[in-house]
Design a protein with these regions (language model features):
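Short Fe-S-cluster ligation motifs
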Residues: 26-44
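Short, acidic/polar
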Residues: 21-30, 87-95, 163, 227
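Short glycine-enriched, charge-decorated loop/helix-capping segments at active-site entrances
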Residues: 15-18, 118-124, 193-196
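Canonical Radical SAM [4Fe-4S] cluster-binding loop centered on the CxxxCxxC motif
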Residues: 1-23
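Glycine-rich, proline-tolerant flexible connector loops at the mouths of alpha/beta enzymes
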Residues: 8-12, 42-51, 114, 186-190
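Acidic, glycine-rich active-site loops and adjacent beta-strand->loop/helix elements
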Residues: 45-46, 76-78, 152
Length: 227
């Protein structure tokens, strides 16, 4: 994605890193004596991270510490692995649920409008696919969050369209718990030539989100983006 400041492609692969299942479990075990209630897992779309990998990971976490709530992966990752492993969204999400998935984070939404999404996040699942995977998860009884990346090349109409699609799905499923506006940060990415929006614009965006998404219980301020 053009707004990403941490991904590393093949030419700079040595600067990147990836965890094995055992390494992830070592991280989980490092919190054994601490009052942790949730493990939050997100990552990239790498070939070795397939359906089997995550099924085994979720099962391992639950076997080690059954009370931990697993909030894991966005539709971007699910779309990639389900397509690669030739399983439907419904089949794939049921496999994840049976393995121990408790909820989904809200990442990967960016902006749903194709004319913007194709420019900033080409190659990711579409906005419609993002919404479809969340709807399937909600229909399985699962809960999830939603996000919107703002302050880049989109305009107000794109933001309103994004909020409207979330609101309509929430009216249908009531499966979203929290909406998280994500402010575009321009350091170390392909959109560094863009200025960041003002704090006043941030406040306006939060206010409009709270008013319009009256069917969402929570609006969250994400400190790495807004702090």
């Amino acid at each position: 994605c053009t707004f990403c400041s941490y991904s590393r492609l093949i030419k700079k692969r040595s600067e990147g890193w990836e965890y094995t299942l055992d390494e992830i479990m070592d991280i989980v075990r490092s919190f054994d004596n601490k009052p942790v209630t949730e493990v939050h897992i997100v990552g990239g779309v790498l070939p070795q991270y397939d359906v089997k990998f995550y099924v085994n990971l979720f099962k391992a976490i639950k076997a080690h510490r059954p009370e931990l709530h697993i909030k894991a992966l966005t539709p971007v990752e699910y779309h990639y692995m389900f397509k690669k492993d030739k399983v439907s969204y419904a089949e794939g999400m049921k496999l994840m649920q049976d393995a121990g998935l408790d909820s989904m984070p809200g990442g990967g939404a960016e902006i749903f409008a194709p004319e913007i999404r194709d420019q900033i996040a080409g190659g990711k699942c579409s906005g419609d696919q993002w919404l479809e995977i969340h709807e399937i998860w909600h229909n399985l009884g699962g809960k999830s969050n939603a996000t919107m990346l703002y302050g880049h090349i989109e305009n107000y109409s794109h933001r309103v369209d994004h909020l409207d699609q979330l609101r309509r799905l929430q009216d249908k499923t009531n499966g979203f718990q929290t909406f998280i506006p994500l402010k575009f940060r321009n350091e170390n990415n392909q959109l560094s030539h863009l200025s960041e929006v003002s704090v006043v614009e941030d406040l306006r965006n939060y206010a409009i989100s709270r008013i319009y998404l009256d069917n969402f219980d929570h609006i969250k301020s994400y400190w790495p983006m807004i702090g």
